[in-house]
Amino acid sequence: SHPVGSGRYMLKQWDRGQQVILEANPGYYGEQPKMKRVTILFMDEDAAFAAVKAGQVDLAYTAASYADQETAGYSLLACETVDNRGFNLPAVPVMEKDGLKVGNDFTSDVLVRRAINLAIDRDEMIQNVLNGYGSPAFSVCDKMPWYNSDAEITCDRDEAARLLDEAGWIVGADGIREKDGVKAELEFLYPADDSVRQALAADTANQLKEIGINASTRGAGWDTAYDEAQSQPLLWGWGAHTPMELYNIYHSMEDTGLAAYSPYANKTVDQYMDEALASDNLEESWELWKKAQWDGSTGITQEGDIPWI
């Protein structure tokens, strides 16, 4: 609660989950900051915009879905970030582990996962949900030095439909695909307090209906969402200037043999990431992270396992 540092500001007060108050450091070696006191409030994007409307804050980080709304006394600043949104697709068939449902019989087929990825029109989603303020995301590390551009694809619903046909999911009389009497259905979860992810989930569901998948959405609290994501898609938010994002999402855990947030395992992918962490050469480690994404024969991209979109 009393960190020692040499930066422009010192921690004056920290109310966990509510706010942080910073004061200018009189001993700072450089030019003194013009703002002598900064209060940072912890609030979600919707609450931040409400604070703007009420004139309670000077600056707010909020959702792009509010970008088309004007507020007197405020101007819009669009910043490029590595922040991204996406969803998991459980990559193993249904099973039970320690009393928890794990896996999904529909998304465990790699052809289905590839079809879903091809069916998503990211540009359309940016316009519909984010008012044009965004860029297509193909991984959790777009634009980073360790990003493998082989992850990039173009929306192709004809090819998506062909892949589903190949996987045995045939369009029925009601327009919904079936296989062995089972409907092609998916429920997309989103954090109940996140309006942007709710809208992204709804847009995703609507797009997948175009290829015969009966998709729906449901809000969930984080007290249950982590467990539910072991067997169905959940809209996640990622973005960090570290390749550990890849490790945390895709590397299998020793106790379960599967990745932490959604069931998936690939020993070759694990090995590349382990070698990257053990490397004492930064540039060489980046190449290993890239190979974990796609090495020409396996990985986590469209031509590989594609367990996240």
What are these model-derived regions, one by one?
Residues P3, R8-V129, P145-I176, D180-G304:
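Extracytoplasmic/periplasmic ligand-capture domains
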Residues L118, A137-S139:
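Short helix- or helix-capping micro-motifs
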